[in-house]
């Protein structure tokens, strides 16, 4: 529980800092999201989408998965795309890769990760 409490404490500190820097931040953020971009990227923890393109929360609609795969059979990804286009009216859709992707590496080297992840990475192998 200490690890979870640490995250909760850090969130509270972040919220306090943001509120002190911009007292209207959370009110404005809660009002609505109106991003121009849909980012489809890798779930790699080293690639924080908003941060690496210097956009604030609400400015980038994000979908992430292992190896930034877009598959016709992935209902989750297809739902994100439809919602982004039809509801949020995003103007740009980006599929973003990165250097050192362990998902792509595992797929291309046929390194088995066992379980459902092997099935998922099959989409990468299919187009390699």
Range-by-range predicted roles:
Residues 57-68:
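Glycine/charged-rich beta-loop-alpha catalytic/anionic-binding loops adjacent to active sites
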Residues 1-35, 67-91, 101-128:
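Divalent-metal-activated hydrolytic enzyme cores
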Residues 40-42, 64, 94-98:
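Short beta-strand segments
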Residues 18-59:
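N-terminal short beta-loop-beta anion/metal-coordinating cradle
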Residues 44-46, 98-103:
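Gly/Ser/Thr-rich loops at beta-strand to alpha-helix junctions
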């Amino acid at each position: 529980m200490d690890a979870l409490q640490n995250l909760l404490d850090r969130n509270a500190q972040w919220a306090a800092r943001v509120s002190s820097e911009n007292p209207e931040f959370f009110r404005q953020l809660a009002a609505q999201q109106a991003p121009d971009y849909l980012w489809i990227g890798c779930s790699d923890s080293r690639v924080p989408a908003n941060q690496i393109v210097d956009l604030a929360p609400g400015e980038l609609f994000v979908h992430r998965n292992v190896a930034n795969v877009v598959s016709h059979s992935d209902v989750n990804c297809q739902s994100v795309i439809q919602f982004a286009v039809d509801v949020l009216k995003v103007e740009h859709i980006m599929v973003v890769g990165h250097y050192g992707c362990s998902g792509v590496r595992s797929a291309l080297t046929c390194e088995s990760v066992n379980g459902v992840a092997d099935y998922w990475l099959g989409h990468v192998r299919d187009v390699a």
